Amino acid sequence: MKSLVLVKQVPDSNSAFRLNAAGTWVDETNLSYTVNDFDRYALEELLKLKDAGKVEEVVALTVGGADAAAALRTCLATGADRAIHVKDEAIAGSDPFVVARAIHAAIASEGFSLILGGLQADDDNHTQVGGLVAGLLDWPFASAAVALSLVDASTLRVERELENNEVQVVDVTLPAVVTVQTGMNTPRYASLKGIMAAKKKPVATLALSDLRLDLKDVEAKLRTVSLAPPPKGKGAEILTGSPDEVAKALVSRIREKTGVL
């Protein structure tokens, strides 16, 4: 069975963020980047299936500019067998449908049986690419997976996280697309041996012309009008004194603000 993991390079959450001049995205100057956290769990799940002898090949794919190659190198060092980089500045940073369309075109002749990806991206939280890819392929789709297991060669059992901590168990017929939650496993890290081996693993680089797409095919349908930081809260009041004095002052403040107590 051939498998594919969809990965995205996103800004490191520890970076210092500020808006760009247009107020439509963050200023990417001097940001550090990493593999989207949700996608790390998807990769680990496929590597576990490969370790168990149920998957023959794990391929990593990303859509983005030249810098996105770093995410693929991380996946290769962690254990993926090869990678596909859809690299074109016309696609980089586009909307979910355009990204899904590029993925669909890139894998048309690959013959994958299982495609995993993260439930969402840490930077934009669109939660759409996996479902759109499944729709373009006309494959079954399951989202928010917290556990996966192969029932047989053609059936994947998926435990899905629902609201109120409920879990739904569904069987999907392969080939299929599944997006996964964080916390479903413990992602492995690249070893020195893996980092060295990654340098010899193949990375196929595809542009729009290779996908038989042109600029009108990748014209974004979604445009960010504005982006704003969360409103700043009012400064906290620090209560001082003995424990009894602080407790009385706290009760007084609650009574003033809410009318209870």
Model-derived segments and spans:
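N-terminal glycine-rich FAD/FM-binding segment characteristic of electron-transfer flavoproteins
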Residues: 1-261
